[in-house]
């Protein structure tokens, strides 16, 4: 990464990815309002957003059509601001109906969603986005935040694990409702996710009883999870994750770092 980041979020592919916002950490962190692009071998520049810096926003889409929604600002407020990225600049668009931080962003710019997250309480709602407007989707069965997630559209979105507490559940969205699938093998939160609901990957995060940070990876085939022999080179959490089941990226760490793996 061009600079150290923690609590950043990402989207895109291993050869065309995006990391957005986050903080410089670890003590008295500066909250960032910039993004940077990844081409598979290196990062390029930074692009400034219109709204003040946040951590723990929900990000989904691609490097040239991304959405960044909500987050937590350095004034201690959970926000409902939303911006879209076109590959060169950010534009403020319609706000979230419900402000959130640490929710799961899934899908594409014109077929995306934010599931769960935190505000005054941990949330169960799904907020769907069609590229212009936000509408209410199907509620998630249990209030959740900080889960690994993925999907390239609303209808192949998923998330696994997360808080409140260390969860092991996997939920898959069909465009209107969430359905439980096979549990992950090791409950975790603050981890990364990549891929779609039939071919997914989770990696890193915290595992019980905490605050141990993991380097472990699990693979999903649409019904069950298996522990992968491949592990992160550096145990990491709360970083920008993007890619597919077979080609994923995890950038940053907490405390803040500039590593990419």
Regions inferred by a protein language model and the residue ranges of each:
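Polar, enzyme-active/binding microenvironments
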Residues: 1-261
